[in-house]
Amino acid sequence: MAGSEAVEDKEIKSAVSSCEAYFEKVQSRKNLPKSLQETLNSAFAGIPVSSFPQVPGGRVIEIQAETPVSEAVKILSDSKILSAPVINTDHESSLDWRERYLGIIDYSSIILWVLESAELAAIALSATSATAAGVGAGAVGALGVAALGMTGPVAAAGLAAAAVGAAVAGGVAAERGIGKDAPTAADKLGKDFYEVILQEEPFKSTTVRTILKSFRWAPFLPVSTESSMLSVMLLLSKYRLRNVPVIKTGEPDIKNYVTQSAVVHGLEGCKGRDWFDHISALPISDLGLPFMSPNEVISIESEELILEAFKRMRDNNIGGLPVVEGLNKKIVGNISMRDIRYLLLQPEVFSNFRQLTVKSFATKIATAGEEYGLAIPAITCRPDSTLGSVINSLASRSVHRVYVAAGDENELYGVITLRDVISCFVSEPPNYFENCLGFSVKEMLNR
């Protein structure tokens, strides 16, 4: 127990250190006059978060922790949202957010769980000769998983006979043989396997709680309606939160949900104000943008597998990648975690995910973009573009990042994210969160 706590404490310290390093780089490079930065901080500190526009529909969609994955997918899809707060069923009536909410579930968490489940199931199917031959499907259950030494959500639930049988019917047994390798087995998983993931046991009964434990991207930290926009902007920039729930003291439900994108849209609406016009007219280079060098930007080649793109995003905790070609890394597209909706909603695409290249996936998305609200082309700017033009691109195109392209061949020079833009407008006063929100950075990142 002490060992796990030590590891957790080390991870928290590492996260804090990463946040500090990022923000120190931002502050040292953006070169805003101290008086202007203090004026901006004072202005944002005077704006209550309660004045921020409500989410569409005026109600934050929440999902119960015991909700099956299939139902969670439907809720997110029907509500046209990418994420939702998760209510701890054991403490649903609690007025303390620390007890009531477990975190935030999003499409990225679900798809990564689905992909891992598919991989593990394929290994189990290919490693058992009886199943590969299409007989004795029940032999591969929790026992088979344990024998193979698997870990993760699937190991916890076990591969029940019904799931294995349905998967076999979906295509694996059609290629009868002994000792098939796992990749081949996975390649043969057809539409029926997609249905297994969401409609058969044990996947059908897998809950949001289970996924949240395995694929948690960021801490859950709400602010009160009395908090300031400075608090929200610091959480969304320095501390890398993608969204900040808003609660009212003494009431259980989340009142609003402020995202990085919504804040940048709000900044876009500040045109005409002296402070905004001054900063937005500056070339991005004057603000130290992009904050990462070309070699630091994580990218994906167009001929690499889409599965590798999603894994790369997961491993680096980022929401998107530029698609590049050639030694000079010419920017030819963009893949983001938002695009995974298409993978979830199109079983014929999912069934071939192990063989699908980024380029092929982009082509399929391009033909369905209008229906699913997806955009595969990369939004770019030049090294001499103004911050205002970047903000306009982010807001008007509803994207999370703009790539900086250089030269005649649109070579990858850098990336500017929503987080980067917000960071340009704020700095953190000493001991700000301890003084204003009543908790330490360590507690925040431990949520």
Swiss-Prot record:
Stored PROSITE patterns: CBS (PS51371)
Any single GO CC term annotated in Swiss-Prot or TrEMBL for this entry: mitochondrion
Signal peptide residue numbers: none
Keyword vocabulary terms for this entry: Acetylation, Carbohydrate metabolism, CBS domain, Phosphoprotein, Repeat
Pfam families: CBS
Domain of life of the source: Eukaryota
PTM-bearing positions, type Phosphoserine: 35
Modified-residue entries (N-acetylalanine), positions: 2
Keyword flag Acetylation: yes
Residue ranges of domain CBS in the record: 54-120, 214-275, 292-350, 374-433
Quaternary structure note: Subunit of a probable heterotrimeric complex consisting of an alpha catalytic (KIN10 or KIN11) subunit, and a beta (KINB) and a gamma (KING or SNF4) non-catalytic regulatory subunits.
Family, per entry: Belongs to the 5'-AMP-activated protein kinase gamma subunit family.
Known function: Regulatory subunit of the probable trimeric SNF1-related protein kinase (SnRK) complex, which may play a role in a signal transduction cascade regulating gene expression and carbohydrate metabolism in higher plants.
PANTHER family: AMP-ACTIVATED PROTEIN KINASE, GAMMA REGULATORY SUBUNIT, SNF1-RELATED PROTEIN KINASE REGULATORY SUBUNIT GAMMA-1-LIKE
Protein name in UniProt: SNF1-related protein kinase regulatory subunit gamma-1-like
Gene name, Swiss-Prot/TrEMBL: CBSCBS2
